[in-house]
Curated annotation (Swiss-Prot):
The keyword Cytoplasm does not apply. Belongs to the OXA1/ALB3/YidC family. Type 1 subfamily. This is Membrane protein insertase YidC. One of its GO terms (molecular function) is membrane insertase activity.
Length: 388
């Protein structure tokens, strides 16, 4: 089946509403490109010497993260106090002092980093996160006694949760339409698989262009955008990298711990060092990550259980499942090697993603059933009219 319109009628002039839609569309495209460029910029910048966060060797010979060295973000506008701490290391017969590079304001962030990633993502998110920590604990400069440290650590967990909730709301706005029309998007993907199967053995440029035009026509016919699904998938990534940078470099989180679990330490690194308490983090994270990534496909398979799929559609669904499993393992490998605070952020993010996926699934099922009932009602009404 072809979704191309053979009609060559002249296009009518665009209305103001249509022009407005085009403007919004291009703003979204430029916004998406800005986010993508910022993310890539940040990925490179985080590992440059002046922005890297390194462990120091303490007096016992143990490698640890500590405030007052390397790159650090201090939220002075929230009353946070911090400065360089003089740590030295003995190497090759000489003593060397660890470097220190601090940012204390939003203006300074743009001036020193000249980076949209740190300016628009890292510092504002760090300010919100640290502000919530201060709201719950009353301070960003906790005392060293166990009670104060525990209160501060628990406050940091709550702050990460609320920040995750805020980020989820922002990223959901990028893919709201595709989420609200999740069932339609899944049906479109099956139809796209059929179109791709139709042109599978055709390698000439004309056939490839025709395939792309058919796919575009299909999305247009269903009043859906290919971009919305793509933007929804990429939107969380800059915030994930921002949280990674924040947990490692923000003083407020460098000093945060809940009992023996420090938010800046990597769980896998600590487990291999004999601190098995960090297994708790991975035991919570791993199943949640698996469920959050596989749930959409599993729900789709459940819904389409009674539907007879074409061979191309079966292959497409299998390919989709394999890709999700691969992505799941990639995320698992990445997350277990980063700071515990990032793992906690991703635990909350996975929980919210599971709730979001299932909520939209229930919404779409309810909408589908209501539509079926309405169709049945109209059919019965037409039958009664025909009998008369």
């Amino acid at each position: 089946m072809s979704y191309l319109n053979a009609s060559k009628n002249k296009k009518a002039p665009k209305t103001k509403k249509e022009i407005f839609k085009v403007v919004i569309k291009w703003l979204k495209v430029f916004g998406f490109l800005f986010i993508l460029v910022s993310m890539l910029w940040g990925c490179v910048q985080m590992y440059q010497a002046q922005y890297s966060v390194n462990q120091i060797v303490d007096m016992t010979g143990k490698s640890v993260y500590t405030p007052g060295v390397s790159f650090e973000i201090i939220l002075s506008s929230l009353g946070e106090q911090g400065s360089k701490v003089h740590h030295f290391v003995y190497d090759k017969g000489s003593f060397f002092e660890y470097g220190y590079n601090a940012i204390t304001s939003w203006k300074e962030t743009f001036k020193l980093t000249q980076s949209p990633f740190y300016g628009f993502f890292v510092y504002p998110t760090a300010w919100i996160l640290a502000g919530m920590i201060k709201l719950f604990s009353g301070t960003l400069n906790p005392l060293l006694d166990k009670s104060s440290q525990l209160t501060y650590g628990i406050s940091s967990i709550f702050a990460i949760f609320l920040t995750t909730l805020l980020i989820k709301g922002i990223t959901l706005s990028f893919g709201w339409k595709s989420q609200i029309n999740q069932e339609k998007m899944q049906d479109i993907q099956l139809k796209v698989a059929d179109i791709q199967a139709k042109y599978k053995d055709k390698k000439d440029m004309q056939s490839k262009q025709k395939q792309q035009l058919e796919i575009q026509a299909l999305y247009k016919k269903e009043n859906m955008s290919q971009f919305s699904a793509l933007a929804g998938s990429f939107a969380p990534l800059p915030f994930l990298f921002a949280i990674y940078a924040i947990v490692r470099s923000t003083r407020a989180l460098k000093i945060a711990s809940v009992g023996p679990i420090a938010l800046i330490e990597g769980p896998w690194q600590q487990i291999t060092a004999g601190n098995y308490i960090y297994i708790i983090i991975l035991a919570i994270y791993l199943p949640l990550q698996a469920v959050s990534m596989l749930l959409p496909t599993l729900l789709q398979m459940k819904k389409q259980k009674s539907i007879t799929l074409t061979e191309a559609q079966k292959k497409s669904r299998k390919k989709q499942l394999i890709m999700q499993v691969v992505m799941m393992f990639v995320f698992i490998i990445i997350i277990v090697s980063v700071a515990t605070g990032v793992c906690i952020y991703w635990i909350f993010s996975s929980i919210l993603q599971i709730i979001q996926t299932y909520a939209f699934y229930l919404y779409n099922e309810k909408k589908r059933k209501a539509g079926n009932q309405e169709r049945q009602r109209r059919l019965r009404q037409m039958e009664r009219m025909n009998l008369k």
